[in-house]
């Protein structure tokens, strides 16, 4: 089985389409699709980090997780995924005319997230669980950024 984190990301985040359809929202589908892409990169990144705790088991089970696939280049790929996630989130906000305040908030969250990845997590499996848990804070921060961006188009 190759890249279970990618399969998880594709299926887990499908809920943004379901929520969009259920609410009959005025948000264009193209904006929701941009959000979906950001969520795929987000899930792929945090679940790759979480999978570092299980590398030995994944090898024994012949489960080709993203952490094994990326190998020694894992941190580079994680940085790329996290930066890509935030780029898509900024594109999402731009597609809805959220403005400067939203961009500043998202850039601030992205810098904190990258510091967390590169200075706190540091590619150590024993730090993976706490990094994984901190994604809740990134999520709530992004939610507030979206709420602020949608109400203050400055």
Set out the residue ranges of the language-model regions.
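Multi-pass alpha-helical membrane architecture of UbiA-family
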Residues: 1-154
